[in-house]
């Protein structure tokens, strides 16, 4: 039978659910956590003290309905070289994001529930963990939708980076733009930049 120490080697982070899936009771799990002084990385998420903390994965575990977007996606897709100061996520309207934004490390955007999964993909972060993030075209739509809160030079740099990419999909971009009701604005920017 596998123990918590082996789970830590395999997963880097452990939760009571992971332990239960491997036949370890909650009692044994929390006993191991207390005896070995595991560090609490988030609500119900533990790691050994010598591991670096994967903040993106922890945020994903804290709010599984949210998708990394905006600044986080710009940086991941190499549309900007500026690493985000705060993590940006998108979730559905009505989600209580107070716990995510309370520490000032996150900014949460909201959309209609049926639009949350538009353009959602699973990517590997710097630690090799899978996290949800929007694809290039959804990221550009998010940029244009929130253009009033983005600095002009950042806005222009991200759009120019997208236009210069070989893997851009303008048809998908226009499809998403119609869903988010920004197709006229997107068309205007694309006509100028292309």
Give the role of each language-model region:
Residues 1-12:
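Short amphipathic alpha-helical interface segments
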Residues 6, 19-20:
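Residue-level marker of alpha-helix boundaries and capping positions
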Residues 9, 22-23, 64:
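Short alpha-helix boundary/capping motifs
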Residues 13-18, 45-194:
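Nucleic-acid-binding surface
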Residues 22-34:
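Short amphipathic alpha-helical interaction segments
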Residues 37-42:
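A short, conserved structural fragment
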């Amino acid at each position: 039978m596998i123990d918590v120490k082996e789970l830590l080697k395999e997963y880097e982070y452990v939760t009571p659910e992971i332990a239960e899936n491997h036949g370890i009771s909650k009692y044994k799990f929390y006993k191991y956590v207390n005896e070995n002084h595991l560090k609490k990385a988030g609500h119900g998420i533990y790691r050994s003290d010598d591991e670096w903390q994967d903040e993106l994965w922890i945020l994903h575990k804290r709010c599984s309905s949210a998708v990394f977007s905006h600044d986080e996606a710009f940086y991941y897709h190499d549309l900007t070289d500026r690493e985000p100061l705060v993590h940006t996520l998108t979730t559905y309207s009505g989600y209580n994001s107070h716990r995510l934004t309370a520490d000032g490390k996150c900014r949460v955007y909201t959309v209609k529930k049926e639009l949350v999964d538009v353009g959602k993909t699973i990517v590997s972060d710097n630690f090799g963990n899978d996290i949800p993030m929007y694809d290039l075209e959804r990221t550009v739509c998010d940029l244009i939708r929130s253009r009033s809160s983005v600095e002009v030079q950042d806005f222009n740099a991200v759009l120019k980076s997208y236009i210069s990419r070989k893997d851009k999909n303008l048809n998908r971009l226009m499809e998403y733009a119609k869903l988010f009701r920004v197709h006229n604005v997107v068309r205007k920017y694309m006509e100028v930049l292309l």
